[in-house]
């Protein structure tokens, strides 16, 4: 499998020693160097296939493009703001994170922030250290009976919910992905955002920073909130519009805010940090010994599992590949690449629409991981993209002038096992269709344009194939073709024919090497092409 040939990994930020040990026990060489400049980082990466970072190292486009051997970047943490995902994807570099490692620590910090907001603990502490005794100034509010709005109900959001419910808080929330039935199972009633704002005494955000979540809390939404609402952001700077938050604090619409993250870190504009009703931390959500150890352990295990071909988890820029490492899917990935390579050789760098069709119950959801493999086969030589792979295939196929669609049909009546994996290429009204399936763990070619092979043709990476179509059954044809092979110094290793379809027969020869030219062949047959994937 691709991405399973790592040899050496650079760890460029401080991580728990368990990370290095797990990598080494998994057979990987490990180099640990911290506080590297961009130039030093590039120099170190010249001999590394893998890179593991936390948040300090900036994996920019310059770094990615200069790191010729780099195949995988692992972020020991959740956010990947410090990795240029577009540049990594374009170069076919896999980016992974550890989505579970920080969850508990971030949730606990959020809960602590809510309690501090309710009782003004940091402000009271500062007052005491200043030699004052101001009991009346720091009148707080109970959490019991208050409503907490949780925006984002993934791992962290649900951990916050269950903890704050123990304080007697009513938890409501919103998440476009998590179903209301699932959130109800951990005690959160989902409502539309416009219904959430006026109900909440406290609001906490736990979403990624996306165009749709940037400025989620803004002047308009603050105006819809209950007067005196308190806001917590331990997720990503920018989800809460900092200018709008400051205005809401100054007007009293917002009674307090607790911020662990900022649009700019560290923030140069100190207006929010210095506001008396703002509690702030220097991005401490993952700063616990347990989270650091867990993140280091998780990213190392993910690297080792990937190298061994066991699994692929935590993928950020190619989520469809997660299933590509399953024992069932692996041979289908090989089949898809083989059919893509066949199509490129047959149709001659096609332009138009590539249709990837899966059939059979076991392939119902496989289209998203099979279509990139088809694209790899189509583009690997035709576009001279030596580094085209399952990560960047969908990006590069658009630049090649191709459109890719996927569809699925159920198994044929009476079909018990795996369905067929089909690929159709439409080219200026001249359809090309190759049909394949997997027998055991071997990809095989079942048919071309309706002509069926019995038995099917094995598709092996070490076996070049020559395919040609004839209209008549000429007894002298096979000796002639073998003679042409001999003239080119190429040996015949296997030979199969299709059943006759519309008066024509497809022939498939396994040969020792690709022929330098097919011109002599085309004088004797209707069409011919060869490929090796």
UniProtKB/Swiss-Prot annotation:
N6-acetyllysine modified-residue sites: 21, 58
Q: Tell me, which GO biological process terms does this entry list?
A: brain development; G1 to G0 transition; gamma-aminobutyric acid metabolic process; glial cell development; glutamine metabolic process; glycine metabolic process; L-serine biosynthetic process; neural tube development
Keywords noted in UniProt:
Acetylation, Amino-acid biosynthesis, Disease variant, Isopeptide bond, NAD, Oxidoreductase, Phosphoprotein, Serine biosynthesis, Ubl conjugation
Q: Which reaction does it catalyse?
A: (2R)-3-phosphoglycerate + NAD(+) = 3-phosphooxypyruvate + NADH + H(+); (R)-2-hydroxyglutarate + NAD(+) = 2-oxoglutarate + NADH + H(+); (S)-malate + NAD(+) = oxaloacetate + NADH + H(+)
Q: State which Enzyme Commission number(s) the record gives.
A: 1.1.1.95, 1.1.1.399, 1.1.1.37
- Provide the binding site for NAD(+): 78, 155-156, 175, 207, 234-236, 260, 283-286
Q: Where is this cross-link: Glycyl lysine isopeptide (Lys-Gly) (interchain with G-Cter in SUMO2)?
A: 21
Q: Where is this cross-link: Glycyl lysine isopeptide (Lys-Gly) (interchain with G-Cter in SUMO1)?
A: 21
Q: What is the effect of changing residue 261 to M?
A: In PHGDHD; results in a four-fold decrease in substrate affinity and a slight increase in maximal enzyme activity with 3-phosphohydroxypyruvate
Catalytic residues as annotated in Swiss-Prot or TrEMBL: 236, 265, 283
Mind telling me what this protein is named? D-3-phosphoglycerate dehydrogenase
* Native source species: Homo sapiens
């Amino acid at each position: 499998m691709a991405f399973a040939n790592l040899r050496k990994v650079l760890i460029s930020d401080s991580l728990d020693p368990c990370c290095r040990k797990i990598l080494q026990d998994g057979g990987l060489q490990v180099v640990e160097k911290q506080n590297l400049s961009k130039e030093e980082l590039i120099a170190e990466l010249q001999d590394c296939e893998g890179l593991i970072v936390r948040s300090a190292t900036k994996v920019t486009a310059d770094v990615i493009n200069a790191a010729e051997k780099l195949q995988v970047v692992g972020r020991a943490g959740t956010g990947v703001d410090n990795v240029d995902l577009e540049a990594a994807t374009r170069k076919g570099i896999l980016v992974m994170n550890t989505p579970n490692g920080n969850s508990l620590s971030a949730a606990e910090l959020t809960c602590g922030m809510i309690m501090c907001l309710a009782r003004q603990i940091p402000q009271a502490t500062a007052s005491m250290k200043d030699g004052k005794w101001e009991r009346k100034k720091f009148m707080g509010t109970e959490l019991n009976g208050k409503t907490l709005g949780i925006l984002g109900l993934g791992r962290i959001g649900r951990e916050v919910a269950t903890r704050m419910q123990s304080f007697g808080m009513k938890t409501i929330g919103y998440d476009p992905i998590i179903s209301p039935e699932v959130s109800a199972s951990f005690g959160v009633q989902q409502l539309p955002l416009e219904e959430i704002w006026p109900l909440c005494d406290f609001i906490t955000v736990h979403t990624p920073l996306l165009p749709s979540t940037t400025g989620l809390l803004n002047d308009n939404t603050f105006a819809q909130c209950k007067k005196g609402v308190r806001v917590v952001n331990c997720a990503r700077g920018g989800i809460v519009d900092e200018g709008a938050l400051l205005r809401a604090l100054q007007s009293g619409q917002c009674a307090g805010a607790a911020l662990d993250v900022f649009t700019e870190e560290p923030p140069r504009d100190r207006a929010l940090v210095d506001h008396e009703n703002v509690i702030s931390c220097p991005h401490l959500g993952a700063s616990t010994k347990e989270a650091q150890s867990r993140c280091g352990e998780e990213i190392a295990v993910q690297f080792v599992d990937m190298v061994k071909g066991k699994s692929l988890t935590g993928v950020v820029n190619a989520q469809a590949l997660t299933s590509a490492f399953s024992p069932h899917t692996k041979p289908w990935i090989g089949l898809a690449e083989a059919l893509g390579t066949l199509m490129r050789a047959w149709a001659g760098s096609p332009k138009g629409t590539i249709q990837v069709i899966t059939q059979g119950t076991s392939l119902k959801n496989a289209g998203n991981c099979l279509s990139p493999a088809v694209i790899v086969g189509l583009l690997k030589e035709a576009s001279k993209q030596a580094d085209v792979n399952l990560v960047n295939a969908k990006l590069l196929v658009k630049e090649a002038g191709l459109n890719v669609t996927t569809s699925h049909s159920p198994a044929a009546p009476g079909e018990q096992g795996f369905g067929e994996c089909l690929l159709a290429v439409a080219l200026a009204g001249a359809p090309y269709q190759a049909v394949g399936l997997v027998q055991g763990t071997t990809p095989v070619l079942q048919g071309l344009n309706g002509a069926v092979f019995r038995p099917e043709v094995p598709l092996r990476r070490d076996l070049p194939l020559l395919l040609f179509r004839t209209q008549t059954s000429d007894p002298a044809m096979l000796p002639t073709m073998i003679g042409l092979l001999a003239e080119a110094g190429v040996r015949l290793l296997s030979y199969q024919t299709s059943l006759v379809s519309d008066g024509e027969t497809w022939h498939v020869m396994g040969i020792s090497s690709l022929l330098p030219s097919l011109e002599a062949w085309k004088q004797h047959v209707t069409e011919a092409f060869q490929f090796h994937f």
